[in-house]
């Protein structure tokens, strides 16, 4: 069986390696686009926005509601009207987390972008650590690893095993040595992120963006972050079916896409 070549990127991606080696970015020049995919997070969305606003960087806050049904949409609109959200986009049907991120990314203008989940599992106080290698000119993308020693809530053993297996499988195909491919926290240069032509709708976003960054031969750093995972009773959405699907996504985006 012959697979399509992995070395046939789009014109936009093909141009990215030539952008490496830039001079450092002055912190005063930073505009951080914060991409917040939201689905039925009425209990936490105000709290996460408080944490986002507390980080002293110039930022563009973009929320995409993926057809919430618990009152989140109305709450988001009130916060937009109050000036707490810069851009608010509503999906007219539930399309998935990846689709919400892609919608937010298309609306972004910042020279660095980061995805921020709305569920309080990831702490915006870790942003400075994620941004430092990009501002120093050492990295094009920085992954925040939950397994490099940062404080974390102790929860599910099998989730950790599953994450290790998926990260290892992804590393085998990308030839990277990441410890946490599935992390939400990926700070990426804005020009890079917007050129990647992402297609995933659900939780395939993480394997896809990792594969595309690797294929473009960009500089990836990994730094430790804190993590406060939720239980399913508290609203955690990802399950074992998403883990199984991730295997297919890793194969697809490294061998076929």
Indicate where each model-derived feature is located.
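Short, well-formed alpha-helical segments that are part of the catalytic scaffolds
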Residues: 17-20, 41-54
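A conserved acidic beta->alpha catalytic loop
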Residues: 65-74, 120
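Short beta-strand/loop segment that forms part of the nucleotide-sugar
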Residues: 49, 53, 58-68, 89-91
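Hydrophobic helical membrane-anchoring modules
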Residues: 1-31, 173-176, 198-257
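Acceptor/aglycone-binding surface of glycosyltransferases and processive sugar-polymer synthases
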Residues: 91-107, 112, 124-203, 229-240, ...
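Acidic helix N-cap motif at the loop->helix transition within catalytic regions
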Residues: 43-47, 70-79
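Conserved donor nucleotide-binding strand/loop of the catalytic core
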Residues: 59-62, 73-107
């Amino acid at each position: 069986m012959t697979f399509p070549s992995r070395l046939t990127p789009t014109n936009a991606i093909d141009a990215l390696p030539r952008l490496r080696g830039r001079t450092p970015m002055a912190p005063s020049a930073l505009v951080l686009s914060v991409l917040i995919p939201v689905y039925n997070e009425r209990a936490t969305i105000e709290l996460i926005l408080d944490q986002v606003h507390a980080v002293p960087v110039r930022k563009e806050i973009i929320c995409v509601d993926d057809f919430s049904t618990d009152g989140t949409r109305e709450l988001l609109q009130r916060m937009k009207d109050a000036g707490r959200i810069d851009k608010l986009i509503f999906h007219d049907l539930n399309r998935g987390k990846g689709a919400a991120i892609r919608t937010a990314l298309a609306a972004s203008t910042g020279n660095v972008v980061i995805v921020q989940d709305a569920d309080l599992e990831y702490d915006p106080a870790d942003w400075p650590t994620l941004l430092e290698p990009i501002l120093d000119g050492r990295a094009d993308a920085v992954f925040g690893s939950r397994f490099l020693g940062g404080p974390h809530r102790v929860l599910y053993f099998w989730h950790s095993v599953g994450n290790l297996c998926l990260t290892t499988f992804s590393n085998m195909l990308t030839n990277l040595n990441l410890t946490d491919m599935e992390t939400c926290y990926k700070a990426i240069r804005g020009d890079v992120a917007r050129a990647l032509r992402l297609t995933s709708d659900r939780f395939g976003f993480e394997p896809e963006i990792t594969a595309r960054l690797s294929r473009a031969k960009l500089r990836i750093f990994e730094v430790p972050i804190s993590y406060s995972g939720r239980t399913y009773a508290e609203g955690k959405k990802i399950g074992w079916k998403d883990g199984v699907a991730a295997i297919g996504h890793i194969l697809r985006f490294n061998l076929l896409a």
